[in-house]
A protein has these predicted regions:
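Long lumenal/extracellular ectodomains of secretory and single-pass membrane proteins
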Residues: 1-309, 319-486
Length: 486
């Protein structure tokens, strides 16, 4: 009886009436599958999801948290990380204290500042004092320093909370305001923070050495105040003779300026296109197909808009795809459409591809039926079928019209089997987890669950996929997260 009761209690429906699961049957996997898709959710919702995972397996929950923040090897989520850090400080401080030393390594030094005013404040101040002393010694020796000084608050900041926090940190370091300001100024000069140059209208810096976020954020200032030199640099980037950092810049951030505004200048188009083309290729050369959700629910009031994230990832992958589906993706809402990317630059490509979004319902069933119907009609051999299908969506699918008692994945498995085809590996990529529901369960075969805005996820999915849980363990069990424990 208990077995059947658990099964029944785990069934729910999407916003569009499809049968689906409340949980994968693993709280940790539920968190892993959605932690990159919680940007629009309330703090309480975020911490509740983490709490459940922590209760199931504290170590896995902590590894998932640091994977979510990891700007070099993970998915680079800042707000969800900081929200959970504060919850840990108030509820599981000992667990958090074991990992405080890794916070800046996986994220930034200012992530630590959310712990001020909590029971972990002393540990944070001790770490800051230790690192600042090491940086000052390195400065005197002419060696490189950390980015701590960049992210510490200034005593002359415009924000009152930042000033109050800066004064508190200064006193804990045994410094008055002047000493603190002088120390940070010297270290920031060594770091060569571009904001200092902009404030002083000093455009003698090297563009190739600037961080990716700053280069994109301040592009208008560069065009306005250093137009010729900036143009020349971006031209060299486009030619491949100059380096432009794009490591922490997400694809959606690059195309976001194309929406909700008037004309964009030729100069800005050229700069954004060069930036787009400089992105690292995480695709891996598989014969895979990207399917992006263009339904109405993908246009909810979030920043970023889920539809923009999905479109950016779809174009990113299709352009770099070396398989049979190079330069193609499928967009779906009421009716799936195979879209060939057209345009001379990323601005034109986005404008062209975006108009295929129907902004209607979310009929994923028709996507798989289109793929299978095409294969059957043309007697396509299994080897020519896509090896993987990436479904980038909010997972609020329509119900199966053929059998509304089945989940979409169950229906698709049965459909392919009935026609003698093996279902390609399916990657459910969540970009907006509004509800606690999952399209598959923990041990379903040939499927993975991921989330977020980061194209690095494509590289994690290169190998053969066994099950959602196996994929999660492959990621979190890597050497990268070995030191993170609860």
């Amino acid at each position: 009886m208990l077995k059947f009761l658990k099964k029944e209690a785990n069934m729910t429906h999407t916003e569009n009436g499809a049968v689906t699961y409340r949980s994968t049957q693993s709280e940790c996997l539920d968190l892993f599958a959605t932690i990159g898709a919680l940007r629009r959710e309330r703090d309480e919702e975020i911490t509740n999801r983490f709490l459940r995972a922590y209760a199931e397996d504290a170590d896995l929950a902590m590894k998932t948290l640091f994977f979510a923040r990891d700007i070099r090897g993970g998915i680079g989520e800042r707000r969800v990380f900081r929200t959970i850090l504060k919850w840990l400080a108030n509820n599981e401080p000992r667990s958090l204290e074991k990992n405080i030393q890794y916070i800046a390594e996986y994220g930034r030094y200012d992530d630590l500042l959310v712990l001020m005013g909590t029971t972990c404040e002393g540990k944070v101040l001790h770490l800051i004092k230790k690192q600042l002393a090491a940086d000052c010694a390195a400065l005197e020796a002419g060696e490189s320093v950390s980015l701590l000084a960049k992210w510490l608050p200034s005593v002359n900041a415009s924000n009152e909370d930042a000033i109050r926090q800066a004064k508190q940190i200064a006193r804990s370091l045994g410094m008055n305001d002047a000493q603190y300001r002088k120390t940070l100024s010297a270290l920031r000069t060594k770091i060569s923070i571009i904001e200092n140059n902009l404030r002083e209208k000093d455009y003698t810096f090297d563009y190739s050495k600037q961080p990716s976020k700053a280069m994109f954020k301040y592009r208008k200032a560069f065009m306005r105040n250093d137009g010729d030199r900036y143009d020349e640099f971006m031209s060299r980037v486009a030619e491949g003779t100059e380096q432009l950092h794009t490591g922490t810049l997400m694809p959606y951030e690059m195309i976001k300026p194309f929406f909700g505004r008037g004309d964009i200048s030729d100069q800005e188009r050229k700069a954004i296109d060069a930036t787009w083309k400089t992105q690292e290729d995480f695709t891996g050369g598989e014969n895979a197909l990207v399917v992006i959700d263009g339904s109405g629910s993908m246009y909810g009031g979030a920043d970023p808009i889920p539809a923009t994230v999905a479109l950016s990832l779809g174009i990113y992958y299709a352009e770099r795809n070396t398989g049979a589906f190079q330069n193609y993706f499928i967009t779906f809402s009421e009716n799936p459409k195979l879209v060939e990317i057209k345009g001379k630059d990323i601005y034109e490509k986005v404008r062209y591809c975006h108009q295929f979004n129907e902004v209607a319902n979310t009929n994923i069933q028709r996507v798989f039926e289109l793929i299978l119907k095409t294969a059957v009609k043309n007697r396509v051999p299994q080897k020519d079928m896509p090896a993987k299908i990436f479904i980038i969506s909010d997972m609020e699918f329509d119900y199966c019209t053929e059998d509304c008692s089945l989940t979409n994945f169950e229906y698709t498995q049965r459909l392919f089997e009935e026609h003698g085809y093996q279902l390609p590996e399916v990657m459910f990529w969540n970009v907006a987890s509004r509800n606690q529901q999952q399209p598959v369960k923990i041990n379903d075969q040939g499927v993975a669950l991921v989330s977020g805005c980061n194209p690095r996820i494509f590289s994690m999915l290169k190998a053969g996929i066994l099950s959602p849980y196996a994929f999660m363990m492959d990621v979190l069990g890597s050497e990268r997260y070995a030191a993170i424990v609860a």
